[in-house]
């Protein structure tokens, strides 16, 4: 019955778990090397970070890219967000450029494509739709664009064109990296 599936799954997962205990350190080493490259490459690192984060969204693996930077110790202890908030008054009162005060802050700019790119995507799709379909297309796209801008959730809008025009999605990822860098 249905309990056989659970029992078989448990038994099969034991050797797979042991296997991953052996091979996961290699994956972790690759992730650490990527983080080292991104933090040490300056503007190129920010570009690669943002482009890679956008490209990985359909797989859900984008969390491996941004979480260590925004909330973890990849750039500063405690993450960029935890560093930014207590220092915001200092940044606001300084006459120095922000890039001198907080050079690691460039990694926080991955959200720029959510604020500016997603409304542009929605408008481009809307105006390229046939006139008789624009009302229906707009009713799908404009709420998705508003959610992207206000909440940072871009998947509904990006998945709207990802499977129809994957090359445009790749261009979107490259432009997002360029906007952040």
PLM ranges: what are they?
Residues 1-10, 19, 94-181:
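Membrane-embedded transport cores of multi-pass solute transporters
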Residues 1-58, 65-70, 181:
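Signature of multi-pass transmembrane helix bundles
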Residues 16, 64, 68-77, 141, ...:
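Generic preference for flexible, low-structure residues
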Residues 44-117, 123-131:
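Membrane-embedded translocation segments of transport machinery
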């Amino acid at each position: 019955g249905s309990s056989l599936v659970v029992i078989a799954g448990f038994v099969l997962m034991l050797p797979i778990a042991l296997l991953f205990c052996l091979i996961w350190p290699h994956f972790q080493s690759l992730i650490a090397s990527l983080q080292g490259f991104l933090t040490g490459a300056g503007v190129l690192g920010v570009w690669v970070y943002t482009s890679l984060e956008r490209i990985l969204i359909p797989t859900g693996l984008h969390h491996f890219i941004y979480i260590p930077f925004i909330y973890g110790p990849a750039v500063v202890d405690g993450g960029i967000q935890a560093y930014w908030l207590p220092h915001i008054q200092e940044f606001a009162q300084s006459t120095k450029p922000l890039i001198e005060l907080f050079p690691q802050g460039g990694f926080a700019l991955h959200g720029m494509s959510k604020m500016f790119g997603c409304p542009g995507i929605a408008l481009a799709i809307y105006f390229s739709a046939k006139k008789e379909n624009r009302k229906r297309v707009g009713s799908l796209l404009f709420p998705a664009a508003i959610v992207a801008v206000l909440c940072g959730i871009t998947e509904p809008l990006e998945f709207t064109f990802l499977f129809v025009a994957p090359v445009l999605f790749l261009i979107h990822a490259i432009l997002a990296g360029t906007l952040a860098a």
